[in-house]
A protein has these predicted regions:
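Residue position within the beta-strands of beta-propeller blades
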Residues: 41, 91-93, 146-148, 188-189
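Structural motif
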Residues: 46-48, 99-105, 152-158, 195-203
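Hydrophobic core
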Residues: 9-13, 17
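Repeated scaffold domains used in trafficking and secretory/extracellular systems
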Residues: 26-32, 67-84, 129-138, 173-182, ...
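Beta-strand-rich domains and repeat architectures in extracellular enzymes and scaffolds
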Residues: 22-45
Length: 231
């Protein structure tokens, strides 16, 4: 009875629109604003779309997404990411699995038709059998940049070519946030584990060579989930 009363009180304190969204779309791992006020979301390996009226609809089922992935691919739905698409693509869906494989699916047209545009095992810089997690990703033209961490506290940031399917290791620093800039560089948040003696900082990362230059320090002993750039 106490649990039921707590749940009812919680729902009363949540604004109606937020409460409806929370009930309709549980466990959202990624959100992407789209044209006409629409919103795409990934939830439990499904792609959902909310229209301008606030109504949610299923766009792609888990079965459809799994069918578009390579054989024996085990998608890590909790770390799936949506990115804006180009050249007619409505959006890009990045699906990692814990072994270090990644698939990139293109969602095209009003029905979000699925096309696999990248799939590969990334050449991880560790000889140990690790469990990998996708931390951040960004797109610049036909190149995707994806930052991973492992359960052995190792890190890998890769450049993935959507044009020819190639990939290469860009950096082994703990990148928590990536944003492409117009001059061929990436704005990155280098955020080591809290136990590390290295300080967190913003840095500029060359998108071709991976060479970095430190911009400014961030408050220590903090973990950052995301940033926004204004100006």
């Amino acid at each position: 009875m106490k649990k039921l009363l707590c749940l009812l009180l919680t729902l009363l304190l949540i604004p109606p629109a937020l409460a409806e969204d929370a009930l309709d779309v549980p466990d959202v791992s990624s959100l992407l604003p789209c044209a006409n006020g629409a919103l795409l979301a990934v939830s439990d390996l499904r792609v959902l779309r909310r229209d301008s009226a606030g109504d949610w609809a299923l766009v792609l089922s888990a079965e459809q997404i799994s069918a578009a992935c390579p054989p024996r691919f085990m998608p890590d739905a909790a770390n799936a990411l949506l990115l804006p698409g180009e050249n007619g693509a409505y959006a890009l869906l990045l699906l990692p699995d814990t072994s270090g494989q990644i698939a990139v699916l293109s969602l095209t047209g009003a029905t979000c038709e699925l096309t696999r545009v990248f799939a590969d095992f990334l050449p991880m810089n560790s000889e140990m059998t690790a469990q990998w997690t996708l931390l951040s990703a960004a797109r610049a033209g036909n190149t995707l940049y994806a930052a991973f961490s492992s359960n052995f506290a190792t890190y890998s940031t890769y450049a993935l070519s959507l044009a020819d399917g190639s990939s290469f290791l860009l950096s082994d620093a703990p990148m928590r946030f990536l944003m492409p800039l117009a001059d061929g560089q990436l704005l990155a948040c280098v955020n080591p584990p809290i136990s590390s003696i290295d300080e967190s900082c913003f840095a500029l990362l060359d998108a071709d060579s991976g060479e970095s230059s430190r911009l400014c320090a961030l408050p220590t002993h903090k973990a950052y989930a995301g940033f926004a750039l204004d100006g």
